[in-house]
C-alpha cells in the first residue's frame, strides 16, 4: 500500500482498549500492521499525533534510505504546512536539496520561506541562502558582477536579520572575511572596499552582539593600517557607541543566561533530544524568552519606532520557533503584531497547537468578529478532535487518574465554550446540537457541560423545566460527585424549586463518599433552610450533620447559617480569631491558638483575653527579598506545587511547637 492511501475500517482491530463503548475517536496506531511495515506504522503515528515533528523526521529518513525523493518532498511539505515559521525545518530541507544539487528546488524553497506571508527570519536560514548565492556567484570567475551580487546578499541578510541577532558572530566574520579577500585592481576599487569595510564596522560596533571586543581591536588595528592620520578621528567618533553596545550586550547576556537556542540544521543532526515536542516545554525557558522580549520593548538602544518594532518582531519570531508548543508565546506574538495580522498569526499558532484552548478561543473571537461562522465551527471541531484523541491515548496508556481527569475537563471546557459561542452567533438550536453531541461521550466528559447547558437554557427561556431535566439527566453519570450536586443545588435554589432541593439532598447524601464535598452540601442546605424554610427543619438537619461529622465545631455551623451574600460576617465581626489572616476559617485545636495570636489576642495570667495593638510589621530581610525577585511567576507552573490549605492543616494537626521556657 502506498503512503498516500488511507486504510479502510477492516484494517482496524475489532477489539482494542479504545473500543469499549466509548464515543472518542479510534486510535490509528491500533490498526493491524505488519511489524516490518515501517512506513505505514509511522504514518499511523503521525495521524494520531500530527504535531510530533520527530515522527516526520523519522519518516523522511526512512524515505532517504529508500531513495524515494518524491515522498521525501511530500513529507517536508506537510511539515512546512504545519510549522511554516519553524525556520530550522526549512534549513534542513534546503540543505538536503543542496546535497541533491537541485538548484530549481532550492530557489523555489528560498523564495517561499524568505518572502511573502511565510517569511522566516533566522540567522541559520539566511546563512544557507548566503551560501547558495556565493556558490552560484563565484567572484573569481564572475568578477565584479558576481561580487556585486554577493555584496547585495550580505547587505540583505544584515538588514533583515544580523543587526537584530546577538549571536550573529559567524555572519559578521564571514562578511568581513569576504571583503578582506577582495583584491582590488584599481585605486577606485580599493577606495570602495575601504568605504564598505568602514561602514560595516560602524554598523557592527554599535550593536549588542557577541565578541564585540575582538571586533573593536580588529577595527582599530585596521584603521591604523589604512591611514594613521585619520585613524584617531574615526576611532574617537565610534568609541562611545561601542562602549554602550558592549554594556548592553553584557546586560542582555546576563538576562538570557541559560537560554537554549540549539536546533538542528541538517537531517542527520535531528534527534529526539534537540527537536521540539508537543506538550513539552520548559517554563524556565519561557520565562527567559518573555524577559528578552520585554528587554527589547524597553528600547535600550533608543531606536526609532519602526526599527524597534522590527527588532521586537525578530525576537518574537525566534521565541515561537524555539517554544512553538507554548501557547503563551504565540498569544503574546499575536497581540504584538498589527491588528490586521492577529488572525493570521493565530491561524499558524493553532496549526502547531491544535488542542490549545487559549489559542482556539482567541482565534474564534476574531473569526466571530469577521463573521466567518463556518471557519469558527471548524476551529472548535478541530480543537475538540485533538483533545479527544489525546484523551483516548491517555485512557489506553496512563494509570494516572488525575491526568485523565484534567484532560476530561479540558475536553468539557472546549465543548462548553463551543456551545455558548454557537448560542451567541447562530442561536439556541445550534448550541443544543453541540450539547447533544457532547453528552454522547458520557463518562468521558465532566459535569460542567450539564451545569453550563442548564443555565444557558434557563437564561434563554426563563423556563425551569428544560434545565431541570438536563441536570436530572446528568445525575445518571455524576450522582456520586459532590461538586455536581453542589452546582445542581445552586441552580435549584436560584429558581426556587424547594421540593426538588429536598429531594436531591435526600437522594444524594448516602452516595457521596468525599466527606469534604458532603459537608459542603449539608451546610448549603442548612443555610437554605435557615433563610427560606423553618427553624425546626434547620435543627433537624444540624442534628444529622453532627451525627455524620461529630468533630465539627458547633459555632462554625451556627455562624455559617448567618452568612450574608456568601460572607460569614458573624465570624468576621464578632469572632475574628476564628479566621486566619487571609479570612479563611480556622476550625479547632492548635490552629485556633495560632489564629488568636495572629489576630493580636493574648491571654493574661487569669485566663482572660485581651487584644494587642499590632505595631509596625518587622521589615522583611533583604535575603528574602532577593530570593523572591528570582523566583518564577506563578503562571509558569501548570499545577499547584504546594497546597497552602493542606500545609496549614498538616502543621496544625501533626506539628507541635514546644512551649518557650
Swiss-Prot record:
It comes from the Eukaryota. One of its GO terms (molecular function) is mRNA binding. InterPro entries: HAT, Rna14-like, Suf, TPR-like_helical_dom_sf. The keyword Transport does not apply. This is mRNA 3'-end-processing protein RNA14. Component of the cleavage factor IA (CFIA) complex, which is involved in the endonucleolytic cleavage during polyadenylation-dependent pre-mRNA 3'-end formation. One of its GO terms (cellular component) is nucleus. Pfam families: Suf (PF05843). It comes from Eremothecium gossypii (strain ATCC 10895 / CBS 109.51 / FGSC 9923 / NRRL Y-1056).
